[in-house]
Amino acid sequence: MQLALAAKYIGASMATLGLGGAAIGIALVFVALINGTSRNPSLRATLFPQAILGFALAEACGLFCLMMSFLLLYAV
């Protein structure tokens, strides 16, 4: 019983490691946006929607990891 509970906690903590990857991905998206805008300010209107799309995809991956962590903790 306690081994299964420990395995559940370890699995949930391993699933949350993806949140760190999502945070790094979001940071890299906006670093690229700032870098591109500083090099060529006239491209801001083109770069911003692509940056928001990249942000949304990176955030979705992080939310999937968080959802899996909650599922491991409370549903299994």
UniProtKB/Swiss-Prot annotation:
Topology in membrane: Multi-pass membrane protein
Main location: mitochondrion
Subcellular location: Mitochondrion membrane
Feature type site, description Reversibly protonated during proton transport: E59
Gene Ontology annotations of biological process type: proton motive force-driven ATP synthesis
Gene Ontology cellular component list: mitochondrial membrane; proton-transporting ATP synthase complex; proton-transporting two-sector ATPase complex, proton-transporting domain
Keywords: CF(0), Hydrogen ion transport, Ion transport, Lipid-binding, Membrane, Mitochondrion, Transmembrane, Transmembrane helix, Transport
Segments crossing the lipid bilayer: 14-34, 52-72
Pfam family, one: ATP-synt_C
GO molecular-function term, one example from the UniProt record: lipid binding
Assembly description: F-type ATPases have 2 components, CF(1) - the catalytic core - and CF(0) - the membrane proton channel. CF(1) has five subunits: alpha(3), beta(3), gamma(1), delta(1), epsilon(1). CF(0) has three main subunits: a, b and c.
Alphabetical list of PANTHER family matching this protein: ATP SYNTHASE LIPID-BINDING PROTEIN, MITOCHONDRIAL (PTHR10031), ATPASE PROTEIN 9 (PTHR10031:SF0)
Function: Mitochondrial membrane ATP synthase (F(1)F(0) ATP synthase or Complex V) produces ATP from ADP in the presence of a proton gradient across the membrane which is generated by electron transport complexes of the respiratory chain. F-type ATPases consist of two structural domains, F(1) - containing the extramembraneous catalytic core and F(0) - containing the membrane proton channel, linked together by a central stalk and a peripheral stalk. During catalysis, ATP synthesis in the catalytic domain of F(1) is coupled via a rotary mechanism of the central stalk subunits to proton translocation.
Similarity-based family: Belongs to the ATPase C chain family.
Protein name: ATP synthase subunit 9, mitochondrial
Organism for this UniProt entry: Debaryomyces hansenii (strain ATCC 36239 / CBS 767 / BCRC 21394 / JCM 1990 / NBRC 0083 / IGC 2968) (Yeast)
